[in-house]
UniProtKB/Swiss-Prot annotation:
The gene is psbB. This is Photosystem II CP47 reaction center protein. Keywords: Chlorophyll, Chloroplast, Chromophore, Membrane, Photosynthesis, Photosystem II, Plastid, Thylakoid, Transmembrane, Transmembrane helix. GO terms for cellular component: chloroplast thylakoid membrane; photosystem II. It is a multi-pass membrane protein.
Length: 508
C-alpha cells in the first residue's frame, strides 16, 4: 500500500473487524506490561523495612496501585505492612500480576482471531451489504458497561460489601491499612482527602453512566446533530475518546501532585507542599509540646516521635527535589535510610534555643542560618570568615540530640556543630547507607513525581491530538475538497481539485 508510518492506521478506517482486533491487541499490550512490570518490581522489591525503606523510596511504580486497591500480601510470605503471612490467597501481588499476563495472552489470541476473521456478518449493514458500525449505539453500550463497572466498584469493592475495601490512612500517613469505606453523601464527600468520597462518587458516576447509556441506546440522535458532529465518522469517536483520556490524565496528574485520598503518602511518598508548609514539622512540634505538657522531659517527648513521622520530615523525600531526568529510585540518590539520629537542638552561649532555617524546595545550596524563637538571626556559617559576626565559633553554639540513635549526646566542637547544622537544613537527620546501591548523593524524585510528569506531558500531547482529529472530522469536506453530501460519482485524478469540475485536467 506504501503508506507512510504516520498514516498506517488508515488500514482500519473502514474495516470494523480489524479495528476491533487492533484495540484488543492494545489491551493485550497494556495488560502484559502491567503484569510484567509487577513481576519485575516484586523481584527487586525489599519488603524488610516498611518504615525507612518503603515502596516509594525503592522506586516501585505499579505496587502502590495494587496496594491502594486492597492487595497487601505476597506468595513470598511477606506483607506490605511488615511481618509474615501464612495464607496470602489467590489475590496476592503475584496473583494479580499473573492474572494480567494470562489476560494479556487471551487478548493476544483474540486479536489474532479477529484480524484473520475480519469480515463478520455482525459488522455488515443489512441494507447496503457494506461494513458499517452504528456508532451512537456502540457509544450507548460502552457508556452503560463502564457505568456498571464504576457503580459496582463503588458499591462492592470500596465499601467492602464484596471486596477488600481500599487503602485508608490518617492525615500523617502513619496508620495506613486496607479497610472498607462507607460512602460520604454529605458535603464532606467533595473533600479530596476524604476516602468516603471515592465510594460515593463511583456510585453516583456509575448511576449516571448507566442511565446515560440506556438513554443513548433507546434514543437516536437528531439528524442535524448527527451530521453536525459527524457522528457517522469513526474519527469523531477517536477525537472524543482522546478528549476523555487527556481530561482524565490532567485530573490524575493533579490528584497525584497535590495529594488526595486516592494517592496515600504511605504508598506514593509525601507531596512537595508538605515540605513547603512544614506540615510534618508542625505535627512533630505539636506532639513534643503535648509530651512536655504531660511533664515528660524533652528527651522523653522526642523519643515518643514515630520514626516514620520523622522520616516524612526530610527533604530527600520531597518529590520536587529530584531532577526530571535523574534516573533511578530515591534510594539510588541519597541512599537507603538506616536510622533516625534524633532531633538536634542548638543553643547559643546565652542559652537561647536556635532553629536552623530549612532549605526551600527549589534550592540546591542554601546559607546555614540559625534564628531564635523571634526569628532574629543569632548564628550562621559565614561565606567570608573575615566579615563574620555570627559564626558558630563567635556565638558559641552547642548542640544536643533528643530522641533517635544519638538521644542525649551533645557536641560543642564548632566543626561538628556546623556539620549537623548543615544537615538540619534538610529536615530531620538520618543515617543513610550509600554503599549498598552505590548511591551518588544526588536527590531523586519519587513515583509521585514520575507519574505527574508522565501524565501531564501525555495530557498535553493528547489535547493536541483531540484538536487535530476533531478538526479533521469536522472539516473533512474542506480538507478533502469533497462535499460529503455529493451524490455524483467523483473520478479521482480527473480534476486538479477533488470534486471541482471547473478544474478538469487537460488530456495530453
Amino acid at each position: 500500500m506504501g503508506l507512510p508510518w504516520y498514516r498506517v492506521h488508515t488500514v482500519v478506517l473502514n474495516d470494523p473487524g480489524r479495528l476491533l482486533s487492533v484495540h484488543i491487541m492494545h489491551t493485550a499490550l497494556v495488560a502484559g506490561w502491567a503484569g510484567s512490570m509487577a513481576l519485575y518490581e516484586l523481584a527487586v522489591f525489599d519488603p524488610s523495612d516498611p518504615v525507612l525503606d518503603p515502596m516509594w523510596r525503592q522506586g516501585m511504580f505499579v505496587i502502590p496501585f495494587m496496594t491502594r486497591l486492597g492487595i497487601t500480601n505476597s506468595w513470598g510470605g511477606w506483607s506490605i505492612t511488615g511481618g509474615t503471612v501464612t495464607n496470602p490467597g489467590i489475590w496476592s501481588y503475584e496473583g494479580v500480576a499473573g492474572s494480567h499476563i494470562v489476560f494479556s495472552g487471551l487478548c493476544f489470541l483474540a486479536a489474532i482471531w479477529h484480524w484473520v476473521y475480519w469480515d463478520l456478518e455482525i459488522f455488515c449493514d443489512e441494507r447496503t451489504g457494506k461494513p458499517s458500525l452504528d456508532l451512537p449505539k456502540i457509544f450507548g453500550i460502552h457508556l452503560f458497561l463502564s457505568g456498571v463497572a464504576c457503580f459496582g466498584f463503588g458499591v462492592f469493592h470500596v465499601t467492602g460489601l464484596y471486596g477488600p475495601g481500599i487503602w485508608v490512612s490518617d492525615p500523617y500517613g502513619l496508620t495506613g491499612k486496607v479497610q472498607p469505606v462507607n460512602p460520604a453523601w454529605g458535603v464532606e464527600g467533595f473533600d479530596p482527602f476524604v476516602p468516603g468520597g471515592i465510594a460515593s462518587h463511583h456510585i453516583a458516576a456509575g448511576t449516571l453512566g448507566i442511565l446515560a447509556g440506556l438513554f443513548h441506546l433507546s434514543v437516536r440522535p437528531p439528524q442535524r446533530l448527527y451530521k453536525g458532529l459527524r457522528m457517522g465518522n469513526i474519527e469523531t469517536v477517536l477525537s472524543s475518546s482522546i478528549a476523555a483520556v487527556f481530561f482524565a490524565a490532567f485530573v490524575v496528574a493533579g490528584t497525584m501532585w497535590y495529594g488526595s485520598a486516592t494517592t496515600p503518602i504511605e504508598l506514593f511518598g509525601p507531596t512537595r507542599y508538605q515540605w513547603d508548609q512544614g506540615y510534618f514539622q508542625q505535627e512533630i512540634y505539636r506532639r513534643v509540646s503535648a509530651g512536655l505538657a504531660e511533664n515528660k522531659s524533652l528527651s522523653e517527648a522526642w523519643s515518643k516521635i514515630p520514626e516514620k513521622l520523622a522520616f516524612y520530615d526530610y527533604i530527600g523525600n520531597n518529590p520536587a527535589k529530584g531532577g526530571l531526568f535523574r534516573a533511578g529510585s530515591m534510594d539510588n540518590g541519597d541512599g537507603i535510610a538506616v536510622g533516625w539520629l534524633g532531633h538536634p537542638i542548638f543553643r547559643d552561649k546565652e542559652g537561647r534555643e536556635l532553629f536552623v532555617r530549612r532549605m526551600p524546595t527549589f534550592f540546591e545550596t542554601f546559607p546555614v542560618v540559625l534564628v531564635d524563637g523571634d526569628g532574629i538571626v543569632r548564628a550562621d556559617v559565614p561565606f567570608r570568615r573575615a566579615e563574620s559576626k555570627y559564626s558558630v565559633e563567635q556565638v558559641g553554639v552547642t548542640l544536643e540530640f533528643y530522641g533517635g540513635e544519638l538521644n542525649g549526646v551533645s557536641y560543642s566542637d564548632p566543626a561538628v556543630v556546623k556539620k549537623y547544622a548543615r544537615r538540619a537544613q534538610l529536615g530531620e537527620i538520618f543515617e543513610l547507607d550509600r554503599a549498598t546501591l552505590k548511591s551518588d548523593g544526588v536527590f531523586r524524585s519519587s513515583p509521585r513525581g514520575w507519574f505527574t510528569f508522565g501524565h501531564a506531558s501525555f495530557a498535553l500531547l493528547f489535547f493536541f491530538g483531540h484538536i487535530w482529529h476533531g478538526a479533521r472530522t469536522l472539516f473533512r469536506d474542506v480538507f478533502a475538497g469533497i462535499d460529503p453530501d455529493l451524490d455524483a460519482q467523483v473520478e479521482f485524478g480527473a480534476f486538479q481539485k477533488l470534486g471541482d469540475p471547473t478544474t478538469r485536467r487537460e488530456v495530453v
